[in-house]
């Protein structure tokens, strides 16, 4: 391949060497050093709401008026990318602050995120809401360190899920900080209660994958999605109001984001939904952040799911280590000179830099694409300086073979 030919990249060969050294447990060095922590005397609560398949362009006054109003009064990261283009990579990058390249080894090692470990050490109550626990992938990664029963509700009906969350909020132990993850699935499932007629019409009344993607149904499919998003916006308003009513909004960090985007064939490549390419339609998502005591300011710089963990570890939990000890992200509140963002899984990677997307795989094959059109850039060559930085990030949490 082009990159291997330049003598410094063949991830496959590197991985094979590393595998010969033994199991994931001996390969993975995460975190790189033990954590040094100055825990705060006054703990903030943490609410993370992940809305399945929420496109970045849905955060506006028409599709999500409630969340837009909330975003206007808090931190709204408008150039925000997930760390992947599917559910597993989106959630992994958000809670580990690591590229998806490490996912297989984290799972093999059943290594929980340092964020969760540290919250447990600081006596946070965990309340998780959504249909996550059934997936083996989460039991071997995100949830691996959670011995106690922390799943309060596995409802797939979002309204009931919110009811369960509100009940939990009212009955938890008042003198301990809490962490709550709420996973809302309506947009990804095109789900709207039958009793609700959404404002976007005409819509597909029933989502059938066999017929939904026909050209004549495109507008109806998009409207169905927009109605599910609009419905979700009302549920978010209900949650945020509940925090206020219980007097918790000034003690609670709130994060609203998504696992990945949702494409409606904008790339003209018969791509629908997620997981099929690294266009911004599938990877760019909203990130709205409320942080008690912080003065909101417009957020113009590009940000990534990889940045949430460093921000929470330092500013919420008092971790003193450099971010590089446990993440490839940076603190959202600190100015950055970073010129690129990374998304990907265990095999494929995408670097977002200016108006270019550089995609490459473990074999070292690469392609340059226009960020807006997702069309190949002919005769383009990758930015070698950036690729070397990225390769370092993809390897530095492994022991050298």
Predicted segments, located by residue:
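Active-site-proximal alpha/beta segments of enzymes that process anionic O-linked groups
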Residues: 1-209, 329
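A long, amphipathic alpha-helix that forms part
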Residues: 11, 163-170, 205-252
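Membrane-interface soluble catalytic domains
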Residues: 22-24, 29-39, 134-135, 241-247, ...
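Extracellular/periplasmic catalytic domains that process cell-envelope and extracellular macromolecules
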Residues: 39-42, 119-121, 172-175, 248-249, ...
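Structural scaffold positions in well-ordered secondary structure
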Residues: 70, 94, 119, 182, ...
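A short beta-strand-to-alpha-helix junction
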Residues: 106-113, 219-231, 277-283, 294-310, ...
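Soluble extramembrane regions of membrane proteins in the secretory/endomembrane system
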Residues: 232, 253, 259, 347-348
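Histidine-centered active-site microenvironments of extracellular/periplasmic hydrolases
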Residues: 244-293
């Amino acid at each position: 391949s082009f990159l291997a030919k330049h003598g410094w990249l063949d991830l496959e060969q590197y991985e094979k060497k590393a595998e010969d050294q033994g199991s994931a447990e001996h390969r993975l060095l995460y975190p790189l050093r033990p954590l040094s922590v100055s825990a705060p005397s006054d703990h903030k609560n943490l609410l993370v709401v992940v809305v399945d398949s929420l496109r970045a362009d849905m955060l506006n006054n028409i599709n999500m008026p409630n969340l837009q109003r909330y975003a206007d009064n808090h931190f709204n990261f408008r150039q925000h990318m997930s760390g992947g283009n599917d559910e597993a990579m989106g959630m992994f990058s958000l809670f580990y602050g690591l590229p998806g390249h490490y996912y297989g080894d984290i799972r093999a090692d059943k290594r929980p995120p340092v964020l969760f470990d540290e919250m447990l050490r600081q006596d946070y109550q965990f309340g998780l809401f959504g249909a996550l626990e059934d997936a083996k992938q989460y039991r071997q990664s995100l949830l691996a360190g959670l011995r106690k029963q922390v799943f309060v509700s596995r409802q797939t009906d979002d309204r009931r899920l919110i009811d369960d969350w509100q009940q939990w909020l009212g009955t938890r132990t008042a003198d301990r900080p809490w962490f709550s993850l709420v996973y809302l699935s309506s947009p990804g499932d095109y789900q709207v209660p039958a009793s609700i007629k959404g404002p976007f019409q005409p819509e597909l009344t029933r989502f059938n994958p066999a017929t939904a993607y026909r050209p004549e149904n495109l507008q109806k499919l998009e409207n169905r999605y927009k109605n599910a998003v609009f419905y979700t916006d009302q549920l978010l308003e209900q949650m945020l109001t509940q925090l206020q009513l219980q007097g918790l909004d000034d003690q609670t960090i709130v994060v609203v984001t998504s696992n990945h985007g949702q494409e409606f064939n904008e790339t003209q490549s018969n791509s629908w939904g997620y997981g099929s390419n690294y266009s911004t339609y599938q990877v760019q998502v909203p990130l709205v952040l409320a942080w008690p005591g912080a003065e909101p300011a417009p957020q113009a710089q590009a940000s990534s799911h990889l940045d949430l963990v460093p921000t929470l570890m330092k500013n919420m939990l008092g971790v003193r280590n450099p971010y590089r000890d446990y993440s490839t992200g940076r603190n959202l509140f600190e100015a950055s000179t970073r010129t690129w963002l990374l998304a990907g899984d265990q095999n494929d990677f995408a670097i977002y830099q200016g108006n270019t997307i550089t995609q490459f795989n473990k074999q070292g094959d690469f392609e340059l694409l226009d960020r807006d059109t997702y069309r190949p850039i002919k005769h383009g060559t990758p930015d070698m300086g950036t690729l070397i930085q990225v390769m370092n990030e993809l390897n530095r949490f492994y022991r050298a073979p």
